[in-house]
Amino acid sequence: MLDPKFLRNELEVTAERLATRGFILDIAHLTQLEEKRKLLQVATEELQASRNAISKSIGQAKARGEDVEAIMAQVGDLGSQLDARKIELAAVLEEVNAIAMSMPNLPDESAPIGADETENVEVRRWGTPRTFNFPIKDHIDLGEGLNGLDFKNAVKITGSRFIVMKGQVARLNRAIGQFMLDLHTIEHGYTEAYVPLLVNEASLLGTGQLPKFGEDLFHTKPATEEGQGLSLIPTAEVPLTNLVRDSIVDEDELPIKLTAHTACFRSEAGSYGKDTRGLIRQHQFDKVEMVQIVKPEDSMAALEALTGHAETVLQRLGLPYRTVILCTGDMGFGSSKTYDIEVWLPAQNTYREISSCSNMKDFQARRMQARYRVKADNKPALLHTLNGSGLAVGRTLVAILENYQNADGSITIPEVLRPYMGGLTQIG
């Protein structure tokens, strides 16, 4: 959520910056609502003051033995007017809040302005794509040839966009996640967390999945009088970041760096027809997530570090990649600046996204009321939150199968994964 004071005082500037993201802010309507809010706020306060003043006179009139029926009627009339104004004010505030919750984050000034992914800017490349002297197979043919990827039974058990992994391919998939966690916890200083795969609506509102992206979630339990509805997590960013919701942490505790390996669940409502085959776009997939919670002045440096942590995974695995900075029109809803890391997939002869690393600044923190106590003045201030994939496990498996394939359909195991594979150097 954007800063309400900045929004009120810099409405034109806000509208211009949001327009670079393709979000059109109705300035006239918002201005009208703000004027109505001010009038109702003043009217409510005046009615409250009048009722309080007249209410005090009732006791004085009674003490003098006077009839207070007329005064009581006046207090009742003021009370009715006050209740009506409060209802009107609440309706205006609810509409303003709905608009505020629908607004994406303001893009950082360093984010390139552009309409879509074609205007993202490449910042670096690492590694050289391998030249093959035999026909390249894609990960589907390779995985099925190893009896390790079973799409047919996944469809029978559940439906499309799910997978059953077996044998050494399943073991390799597990090894990838374990390697990532060890790298981030041992070398990069993250604390591993085990988190719920089901989260409530307050958590999803806090990190920005609700209300805008409700259709992309798997809802398992509707809201009732007894409690909030529950949904499967689309990313571990949700439970990890919400650990500081409604909290004030000490400045000395910062930065907080957390990582988790979880299953993630997405309906992919807006991606009909895209990547319908294989592991690239699944309803259920594993991901190792990194989250950093930092002081505002540290968040841009933290974004560079977090992106570097994701890149290190690919470097250790020997997988060629490129890093791009997303333009304003391609950034995620809550992000102010995002780097996408794209891994080379030989069968597609292109780079595909394997990690997205974002600085949310105080956008999520304001929604969550996540703050820290500033040592200098002992006052609370909003935190900055960051998140990134470190990495998507399934897509990493795809990249390893395709980049490390051999002419006979076997797969060479990257050296860093061999300790997790019982010393195996290849499968198949």
Swiss-Prot record:
Subcellular localization(s) per the UniProt record: Cytoplasm
GO terms for biological process, alphabetical: selenocysteine biosynthetic process; seryl-tRNA aminoacylation
Signal peptide residue numbers: none
PROSITE patterns per the UniProt record, alphabetical: AA_TRNA_LIGASE_II
Binding site for ATP: 266-268, 353-356
Gene3D superfamilies, A to Z: Bira Bifunctional Protein, Domain 2, Serine-tRNA synthetase, tRNA binding domain
Nucleus found in the keyword field: no
Entry GO MF terms: ATP binding; serine-tRNA ligase activity
Taxonomy, superkingdom: Bacteria
Binding-site residues for L-serine, renumbered to this chain: 235-237, 289, 389
Pfam families xrefs: Seryl_tRNA_N, tRNA-synt_2b
UniProt-listed Enzyme Commission number(s): 6.1.1.11
Matching InterPro entries: aa-tRNA-synt_IIb, aa-tRNA-synth_II, aa-tRNA-synth_II/BPL/LPL, Ser-tRNA-ligase_type_1, Ser-tRNA-synth_1_N, SerRS_1_N_sf, SerRS_core, tRNA-bd_arm
Keywords carried by this UniProt record: Aminoacyl-tRNA synthetase, ATP-binding, Cytoplasm, Ligase, Nucleotide-binding, Protein biosynthesis
Catalysis performed (reactions): tRNA(Ser) + L-serine + ATP = L-seryl-tRNA(Ser) + AMP + diphosphate + H(+); tRNA(Sec) + L-serine + ATP = L-seryl-tRNA(Sec) + AMP + diphosphate + H(+)
Pathway assignment: Aminoacyl-tRNA biosynthesis; selenocysteinyl-tRNA(Sec) biosynthesis; L-seryl-tRNA(Sec) from L-serine and tRNA(Sec): step 1/1
Gene Ontology CC terms, in alphabetical order: cytoplasm
Aminoacyl-tRNA synthetase as UniProt keyword: yes
Subunit comment: Homodimer. The tRNA molecule binds across the dimer.
NCBIfam families (alphabetical): serS
Family: Belongs to the class-II aminoacyl-tRNA synthetase family. Type-1 seryl-tRNA synthetase subfamily.
Function of the protein: Catalyzes the attachment of serine to tRNA(Ser). Is also able to aminoacylate tRNA(Sec) with serine, to form the misacylated tRNA L-seryl-tRNA(Sec), which will be further converted into selenocysteinyl-tRNA(Sec).
Note on domains (UniProt): Consists of two distinct domains, a catalytic core and a N-terminal extension that is involved in tRNA binding.
Protein name, per record: Serine--tRNA ligase
